[in-house]
Amino acid sequence: MKKYILVLLFSVSVTHSQTFQVEKLNGNVKMLSSNSNTWQQVKSKMILNENDVVSTDKNSSVLIKGNDLSFTLKESSAITVANIKNMTLDELILALAMENVMNTPRKKGNEKSDNTGVYGDKISKETLSTLNSNDFGMKRLNGAKQLAENGMKESAIVASKEVYRKYPDTKKDAESRIYFADLLFGSGLYEESYDEYTEIKLLELKSEQKSHVNEKLEQINKKLINK
């Protein structure tokens, strides 16, 4: 993948940000913006910006529409609005390279939460505690899966990588890890998916999960040998 990065930095077109609007909602739906330090109730016709995080409770959902996209966030899920977009394979490769850079160990003394970096130091302790919890990380993984279900597979992969970086404990969930590794495999990114399956193999897996992971690793080995 590395040999493509320098080329992509110059060749990938800049994606123009969209403004999204809440079209329909059901139940308890909240949002957190960079201009607020607490969660706010989402209302119909509310305008959402790309840094906003939207979260649904159980038995709740929200329909979000942009210029050329619509997305329904189902119950017990969360998503950053910026992730609601279509991406090309080249854009995905570049985003994965950037995620690798973000995963580089930080220097001592630079231990600020990623969420504090986005929402500022004025964010309330209660809100920050919710944002940084493993449960909220799982809600964001649910949202990432729904991106894939709506045809935005590349964005789903990027969203999952961000979640795994910010919420390391969510990487222990084998079912979700396999789901997103399969998306990488389906995108033809065999080296990247191989790395994922190799990590997943170290988790506590059910027998069918072990078989699936081993089968994928064998398939990738054959593809890379014949490359």
Predicted feature locations:
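Sec-dependent N-terminal signal peptides
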Residues: Y4-S13
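Glycine- and acidic-residue-biased ligand/ion/polar-headgroup-sensing regions
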Residues: Q18-N37, D57-S61, L69, E75-S77, ...
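TPR-adjacent "capping" and linker segments in tetratricopeptide-repeat scaffold/adaptor proteins
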Residues: D114, G120-R140, Y167-D169
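Short solvent-exposed coil/turn linkers within tandem alpha-helical repeat scaffolds
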Residues: K166-K171, I200-E215
